[in-house]
Amino acid sequence: MSDYILGIESSCDDTSAAVIKDGFLLSNVIASQQVHKDYGGVVPELASRAHEQNIVPVVSQALDKAGIKASDLTAIAFTRGPGLLGSLLVGTSFAKALGVALNIPIIMVNHLQGHILADFVKQEGKENHHPSFPYLCLLVSGGNSQIVKVNGPLDYEILGQTIDDAVGEAFDKCSKMMGLGYPGGPVIDRLAKLGDPDRFKFAKPQIPGLDYSFSGVKTSLLYFVRDEMAKDPDFMEKNKEDICAGFQKTLIDILMDKLIKAARQTGVKEVTIGGGVSANSGLRSRIEEEGRKRGWNTYLPEFKFTTDNAAMIAIAGWFHYLAGERTPLDIAPVSRIAYY
């Protein structure tokens, strides 16, 4: 008998629902919120209200595209955290209510675990490649920057993480600082392709071990732009491509230096990336380049699985389901959560 898992993702500003059948993706529906662009970042209250409006039609579309009825579902996987509490509450409450109505189990999932396991989402008609255990995952997003050693589907070891800002936050804040808009990652990536990455240099932090820090890079860019704009008010407009190229190269260098060190220390040759920043073209090219140079087997998630989506929540939930794990109905969402 086949297992149909409904995944629900609502940790930030994307409402998503997906259905998998025995690990194969049948549908993945995402409703993104455009209202936050006007504010230069996600407004939690607006995000949770939009989730309330989107959750029912998004789940309905996911079931329709999968060609099944709600009564065919085996279990419901949902994001418990980390994320915005108001947004998480919408997805958690819906999952609990639907689980009770259908008399099927619910399964809580760590949002970051979903990103880590995104490569395991199988699709009909495609070659489905995923890393072998153990593997290293460079997890990079707006809220997190970590190097995780993945020993098994439910066995994680954090080797290093940011001690201040996440790399995605650095992209967003510096894009706003330069007047390039939100979200910053795609804009900076696009402009960086047109610029000289070696023309402008920015400070790199000297953090021991495998931890990251990105606050100093932001400060370095801030002072640089401020000083140059004082000399020439048009400096930013004249040089934005080169500034973006240099800034992006600095961030990628920081990320890769620690990942290379982690691979050397652990001896692990299976390497993947996950999270929203894993869509960055410069980072994807660099990790493939380093992989060829160092004999790594590298895995890059499809672009549709880099941003927040329910397919990754469904596959993570499926692994929990196979392990016999179930979540009680008195569970509540949390903004911060450990791997489990």
What residue ranges belong to the model's regions?
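Short Gly/Thr/Asp-enriched flexible loops that form oxyanion-binding sites at enzyme active sites
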Residues: 78-103, 121-122, 281-290
